[in-house]
Amino acid sequence: MIISGKELSARLKAEMAAQVAAFPEKYGRVPHLVVILVGEDPGSVSYVTGKAKASEVVGIKNTTIRKPDSITEDELLCMIRELNEDDSVDGILVQLPLPKHISEDKVIATIAKEKDVDGFHPLNVAALWQKQECVLPCTPKGIIKMMKAAGVEIKGKRAVVIGRSNIVGLPVSKLLLDENATVTIAHSRTVNLPEVTRNAEILVVAIGRPKFVTADMVSEGTVVIDVGVNRDPETGKLCGDVDYAAIEPKASVITPVPGGVGPMTICCLMENTIECFLRRIRWSVTD
Protein backbone atom coordinates (compact mmCIF):
# COMPACT_ATOMS: atom_id res chain seq x y z
CA MET A 1 0.00 0.00 0.00
CA ILE A 2 1.22 3.47 -0.89
CA ILE A 3 0.23 6.17 1.63
CA SER A 4 -0.47 9.41 -0.20
CA GLY A 5 0.25 12.26 2.19
CA LYS A 6 -1.16 14.57 -0.44
CA GLU A 7 -4.59 12.92 -0.36
CA LEU A 8 -4.70 12.49 3.42
CA SER A 9 -3.62 16.07 4.07
CA ALA A 10 -6.28 17.35 1.66
CA ARG A 11 -8.99 15.55 3.65
CA LEU A 12 -7.65 16.79 6.97
CA LYS A 13 -7.33 20.38 5.72
CA ALA A 14 -10.94 20.29 4.55
CA GLU A 15 -11.98 19.22 8.05
CA MET A 16 -9.90 22.00 9.60
CA ALA A 17 -11.38 24.55 7.20
CA ALA A 18 -14.88 23.64 8.39
CA GLN A 19 -13.70 24.01 12.00
CA VAL A 20 -12.02 27.38 11.41
CA ALA A 21 -15.03 28.73 9.51
CA ALA A 22 -16.95 28.80 12.80
CA PHE A 23 -14.25 30.69 14.69
CA PRO A 24 -15.14 34.30 13.73
CA GLU A 25 -18.63 33.94 15.19
CA LYS A 26 -17.45 31.91 18.17
CA TYR A 27 -14.19 33.69 19.04
CA GLY A 28 -14.22 36.90 17.01
CA ARG A 29 -11.31 35.99 14.73
CA VAL A 30 -9.36 33.17 13.07
CA PRO A 31 -5.92 31.83 14.07
CA HIS A 32 -2.96 33.94 12.94
CA LEU A 33 0.34 32.35 11.89
CA VAL A 34 3.46 34.47 11.33
CA VAL A 35 6.28 32.93 9.29
CA ILE A 36 9.70 34.59 9.20
CA LEU A 37 11.90 33.88 6.19
CA VAL A 38 15.53 34.99 6.33
CA GLY A 39 17.31 35.05 2.98
CA GLU A 40 16.26 33.60 -0.36
CA ASP A 41 17.20 29.93 -0.14
CA PRO A 42 15.09 28.29 -2.90
CA GLY A 43 14.08 25.36 -0.71
CA SER A 44 13.03 27.65 2.14
CA VAL A 45 11.10 29.92 -0.21
CA SER A 46 9.24 26.88 -1.56
CA TYR A 47 8.38 25.64 1.94
CA VAL A 48 7.15 29.07 3.04
CA THR A 49 5.00 29.37 -0.08
CA GLY A 50 3.49 25.96 0.66
CA LYS A 51 2.64 27.03 4.20
CA ALA A 52 0.94 30.19 2.93
CA LYS A 53 -1.15 28.17 0.46
CA ALA A 54 -2.18 25.69 3.14
CA SER A 55 -3.16 28.54 5.46
CA GLU A 56 -5.40 29.95 2.74
CA VAL A 57 -7.10 26.58 2.24
CA VAL A 58 -7.72 26.12 5.97
CA GLY A 59 -8.76 29.73 6.56
CA ILE A 60 -5.88 30.68 8.83
CA LYS A 61 -4.48 34.19 8.60
CA ASN A 62 -0.90 33.95 7.37
CA THR A 63 1.69 36.71 7.54
CA THR A 64 5.07 36.08 5.94
CA ILE A 65 7.88 38.40 7.02
CA ARG A 66 10.84 38.34 4.63
CA LYS A 67 14.21 39.57 5.83
CA PRO A 68 17.59 39.64 4.06
CA ASP A 69 20.27 37.24 5.25
CA SER A 70 22.21 40.30 6.41
CA ILE A 71 19.81 40.71 9.36
CA THR A 72 21.65 40.46 12.66
CA GLU A 73 20.84 37.91 15.32
CA ASP A 74 19.80 40.65 17.75
CA GLU A 75 17.44 42.18 15.18
CA LEU A 76 15.78 38.82 14.56
CA LEU A 77 15.45 38.04 18.28
CA CYS A 78 13.95 41.48 18.88
CA MET A 79 11.38 40.87 16.14
CA ILE A 80 10.43 37.54 17.69
CA ARG A 81 10.01 39.11 21.14
CA GLU A 82 7.65 41.71 19.66
CA LEU A 83 5.57 38.94 18.06
CA ASN A 84 5.52 37.11 21.39
CA GLU A 85 3.83 40.16 22.93
CA ASP A 86 1.37 40.63 20.05
CA ASP A 87 -1.98 39.20 21.18
CA SER A 88 -3.19 38.97 17.58
CA VAL A 89 -0.48 36.39 16.78
CA ASP A 90 -1.11 32.75 17.74
CA GLY A 91 1.78 30.98 16.04
CA ILE A 92 5.36 31.95 15.18
CA LEU A 93 7.58 29.96 12.83
CA VAL A 94 11.11 30.88 11.77
CA GLN A 95 12.00 28.97 8.63
CA LEU A 96 15.17 26.90 9.01
CA PRO A 97 18.01 26.77 8.13
CA LEU A 98 19.24 30.22 9.13
CA PRO A 99 22.45 32.01 8.07
CA LYS A 100 25.52 30.82 9.96
CA HIS A 101 25.84 34.04 11.98
CA ILE A 102 22.44 33.40 13.63
CA SER A 103 22.07 30.76 16.34
CA GLU A 104 19.11 28.52 15.57
CA ASP A 105 19.04 27.39 19.20
CA LYS A 106 18.70 30.99 20.42
CA VAL A 107 15.97 31.72 17.89
CA ILE A 108 13.97 28.62 18.83
CA ALA A 109 14.31 29.33 22.55
CA THR A 110 13.18 32.95 22.08
CA ILE A 111 9.84 32.02 20.51
CA ALA A 112 7.16 31.93 23.22
CA LYS A 113 6.40 28.32 24.16
CA GLU A 114 2.68 28.84 23.63
CA LYS A 115 3.27 30.19 20.09
CA ASP A 116 5.86 27.60 19.06
CA VAL A 117 3.92 25.86 16.27
CA ASP A 118 6.99 23.82 15.25
CA GLY A 119 7.22 22.21 18.69
CA PHE A 120 10.96 22.89 18.89
CA HIS A 121 11.08 25.08 22.02
CA PRO A 122 13.06 23.40 24.83
CA LEU A 123 10.02 23.51 27.13
CA ASN A 124 7.84 21.83 24.50
CA VAL A 125 10.51 19.18 23.96
CA ALA A 126 10.69 18.58 27.71
CA ALA A 127 6.91 18.33 27.93
CA LEU A 128 6.88 15.77 25.10
CA TRP A 129 9.29 13.51 26.97
CA GLN A 130 7.37 14.00 30.24
CA LYS A 131 4.06 13.10 28.54
CA GLN A 132 2.63 16.52 29.32
CA GLU A 133 0.47 18.74 27.11
CA CYS A 134 2.67 20.28 24.43
CA VAL A 135 2.94 21.24 20.78
CA LEU A 136 4.09 18.14 18.88
CA PRO A 137 6.73 18.55 16.14
CA CYS A 138 4.95 18.58 12.77
CA THR A 139 6.80 15.85 10.87
CA PRO A 140 6.72 13.20 13.62
CA LYS A 141 3.08 14.02 14.29
CA GLY A 142 2.30 13.63 10.59
CA ILE A 143 4.11 10.28 10.42
CA ILE A 144 1.96 8.81 13.20
CA LYS A 145 -1.21 10.16 11.58
CA MET A 146 -0.24 8.57 8.25
CA MET A 147 0.37 5.15 9.78
CA LYS A 148 -2.90 5.24 11.70
CA ALA A 149 -4.82 6.33 8.59
CA ALA A 150 -3.34 3.35 6.74
CA GLY A 151 -4.43 1.01 9.51
CA VAL A 152 -0.87 0.20 10.60
CA GLU A 153 -0.74 -1.55 13.98
CA ILE A 154 2.06 0.16 15.92
CA LYS A 155 1.57 -1.45 19.33
CA GLY A 156 4.12 -4.16 20.04
CA LYS A 157 5.93 -3.74 16.71
CA ARG A 158 9.70 -3.47 16.27
CA ALA A 159 10.34 0.05 14.97
CA VAL A 160 13.71 1.26 13.71
CA VAL A 161 14.33 4.97 13.21
CA ILE A 162 17.40 5.90 11.15
CA GLY A 163 18.38 9.41 12.22
CA ARG A 164 18.64 11.10 15.61
CA SER A 165 17.88 14.75 14.86
CA ASN A 166 15.88 16.91 17.24
CA ILE A 167 13.46 17.68 14.41
CA VAL A 168 12.49 14.15 13.33
CA GLY A 169 14.52 11.22 14.65
CA LEU A 170 14.29 11.73 18.40
CA PRO A 171 10.69 13.00 18.60
CA VAL A 172 9.28 10.36 16.24
CA SER A 173 11.03 7.73 18.37
CA LYS A 174 9.22 9.11 21.43
CA LEU A 175 5.85 9.13 19.66
CA LEU A 176 6.40 5.52 18.56
CA LEU A 177 7.23 4.63 22.17
CA ASP A 178 4.02 6.33 23.27
CA GLU A 179 2.18 4.07 20.81
CA ASN A 180 3.85 1.09 22.55
CA ALA A 181 6.28 0.15 19.79
CA THR A 182 9.70 -1.28 20.67
CA VAL A 183 12.03 1.35 19.26
CA THR A 184 15.63 1.24 18.08
CA ILE A 185 17.37 4.46 17.02
CA ALA A 186 20.06 3.89 14.39
CA HIS A 187 22.56 6.44 13.10
CA SER A 188 25.89 6.92 11.30
CA ARG A 189 27.81 5.04 14.00
CA THR A 190 25.47 2.04 14.12
CA VAL A 191 27.36 -1.22 13.57
CA ASN A 192 25.94 -3.50 10.84
CA LEU A 193 23.01 -1.24 9.99
CA PRO A 194 21.46 -3.62 7.41
CA GLU A 195 21.08 -6.29 10.10
CA VAL A 196 19.31 -3.75 12.33
CA THR A 197 16.95 -2.53 9.59
CA ARG A 198 16.07 -6.04 8.41
CA ASN A 199 14.74 -6.71 11.91
CA ALA A 200 12.33 -3.75 11.64
CA GLU A 201 8.60 -4.15 11.19
CA ILE A 202 8.34 -0.35 10.96
CA LEU A 203 11.24 1.58 9.40
CA VAL A 204 11.40 5.38 9.55
CA VAL A 205 14.27 6.92 7.57
CA ALA A 206 15.32 10.54 8.13
CA ILE A 207 18.98 11.03 7.27
CA GLY A 208 19.00 13.21 4.15
CA ARG A 209 20.95 10.80 1.91
CA PRO A 210 19.38 9.94 -1.47
CA LYS A 211 18.33 6.30 -1.85
CA PHE A 212 20.48 5.30 1.12
CA VAL A 213 18.25 2.40 2.16
CA THR A 214 18.39 -0.36 -0.44
CA ALA A 215 16.16 -3.38 -0.96
CA ASP A 216 18.54 -5.77 0.81
CA MET A 217 18.17 -3.69 3.99
CA VAL A 218 14.40 -4.24 4.23
CA SER A 219 12.43 -7.39 5.03
CA GLU A 220 9.21 -8.42 3.29
CA GLY A 221 6.13 -6.73 4.73
CA THR A 222 7.91 -3.84 6.42
CA VAL A 223 6.16 -0.49 6.87
CA VAL A 224 8.56 2.06 5.33
CA ILE A 225 8.23 5.77 6.12
CA ASP A 226 10.59 7.91 4.02
CA VAL A 227 11.15 11.38 5.48
CA GLY A 228 14.05 12.39 3.22
CA VAL A 229 13.79 14.99 0.47
CA ASN A 230 16.83 14.92 -1.80
CA ARG A 231 17.88 15.38 -5.40
CA ASP A 232 18.78 12.19 -7.22
CA PRO A 233 22.41 12.73 -8.27
CA GLU A 234 21.76 10.86 -11.54
CA THR A 235 18.43 12.32 -12.67
CA GLY A 236 18.18 15.55 -10.67
CA LYS A 237 14.64 14.60 -9.65
CA LEU A 238 13.32 14.63 -6.09
CA CYS A 239 13.84 11.40 -4.22
CA GLY A 240 13.77 10.13 -0.67
CA ASP A 241 16.22 8.37 1.61
CA VAL A 242 15.06 4.94 0.41
CA ASP A 243 15.31 3.34 -3.02
CA TYR A 244 11.58 3.55 -3.63
CA ALA A 245 11.40 1.55 -6.87
CA ALA A 246 13.32 -1.36 -5.38
CA ILE A 247 11.66 -1.36 -1.95
CA GLU A 248 8.01 -0.65 -2.83
CA PRO A 249 7.31 -4.26 -3.96
CA LYS A 250 8.64 -5.61 -0.63
CA ALA A 251 6.95 -3.10 1.69
CA SER A 252 3.47 -3.64 3.10
CA VAL A 253 3.11 0.14 3.38
CA ILE A 254 5.38 2.84 1.97
CA THR A 255 5.36 6.63 1.60
CA PRO A 256 6.44 8.23 -1.69
CA VAL A 257 8.71 11.23 -2.23
CA PRO A 258 7.36 13.69 -3.16
CA GLY A 259 3.76 13.49 -1.98
CA GLY A 260 4.29 11.51 1.20
CA VAL A 261 5.44 12.89 4.53
CA GLY A 262 5.99 16.45 3.23
CA PRO A 263 2.32 17.40 2.74
CA MET A 264 1.48 15.94 6.15
CA THR A 265 4.14 18.09 7.81
CA ILE A 266 2.45 21.24 6.52
CA CYS A 267 -0.97 19.82 7.41
CA CYS A 268 0.16 19.29 11.00
CA LEU A 269 1.55 22.82 11.10
CA MET A 270 -1.97 24.05 10.37
CA GLU A 271 -3.33 21.79 13.11
CA ASN A 272 -0.71 23.05 15.58
CA THR A 273 -1.61 26.67 14.76
CA ILE A 274 -5.26 25.95 15.51
CA GLU A 275 -4.29 24.17 18.75
CA CYS A 276 -2.14 27.13 19.86
CA PHE A 277 -5.02 29.49 19.07
CA LEU A 278 -7.53 27.44 21.08
CA ARG A 279 -5.15 27.07 24.04
CA ARG A 280 -4.63 30.84 24.13
CA ILE A 281 -8.40 31.38 23.97
CA ARG A 282 -8.85 28.92 26.83
CA TRP A 283 -6.17 30.59 28.93
CA SER A 284 -7.62 34.06 28.34
CA VAL A 285 -11.01 32.85 29.58
CA THR A 286 -9.57 31.30 32.75
CA ASP A 287 -7.25 34.24 33.58
Identify the role of each PLM range:
Residues 1-27:
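Positively charged, low-complexity intrinsically disordered leader regions
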